[in-house]
């Protein structure tokens, strides 16, 4: 069937597709024809956004239908993608090796419940301290790591 895809900026193209075509496949064809990256496309039919995983027939899109193309700004796409990535990582992650080692040490000295509470508080304090670091603090730390000889000389000068 013949479809017309019209971008809001005025460009348009005619496409020959099957009504069983996936919306995601159509977006790839539109990308080639109108030079709009797939991730920046939002296709609309009668004002309704089309989902990538659905087929054109799911929306009763027939021959000679006209679809509207909204081009999302790249900044918005990147924000959406990073937000989606954050949602995927919200599940509790395994603790890094340093925290695992601290947990083992705490387990030797406290009951399991107390060790867990102490570790949780330690992690909260650590995260809070990190979040309060300024750019100047980070720069100072980096200088100390990159130029330890200067730091030692300064510290010796203060101790006299």
Swiss-Prot record:
It comes from Rhinolophus ferrumequinum (Greater horseshoe bat). It comes from the Eukaryota. As part of a cytosolic protein quality control complex, the BAG6/BAT3 complex, maintains misfolded and hydrophobic patches-containing proteins in a soluble state and participates in their proper delivery to the endoplasmic reticulum or alternatively can promote their sorting to the proteasome where they undergo degradation. The BAG6/BAT3 complex is involved in the post-translational delivery of tail-anchored/type II transmembrane proteins to the endoplasmic reticulum membrane. The lineage of its organism: Eukaryota, Metazoa, Chordata, Craniata, Vertebrata. There is a cross-link at residue 48 (Glycyl lysine isopeptide (Lys-Gly) (interchain with G-Cter in ubiquitin)). Component of the BAG6/BAT3 complex, at least composed of BAG6, UBL4A and GET4/TRC35. Interacts with BAG6; the interaction is direct and required for UBL4A protein stability. Interacts with USP13; may be indirect via BAG6. This is Ubiquitin-like protein 4A. One of its GO terms (molecular function) is protein-folding chaperone binding. One of its GO terms (biological process) is tail-anchored membrane protein insertion into ER membrane. One of its GO terms (cellular component) is BAT3 complex. Polyubiquitinated. Ubiquitination by AMFR and deubiquitination by USP13 may regulate the interaction between the BAG6/BAT complex and SGTA and therefore may regulate client proteins fate.
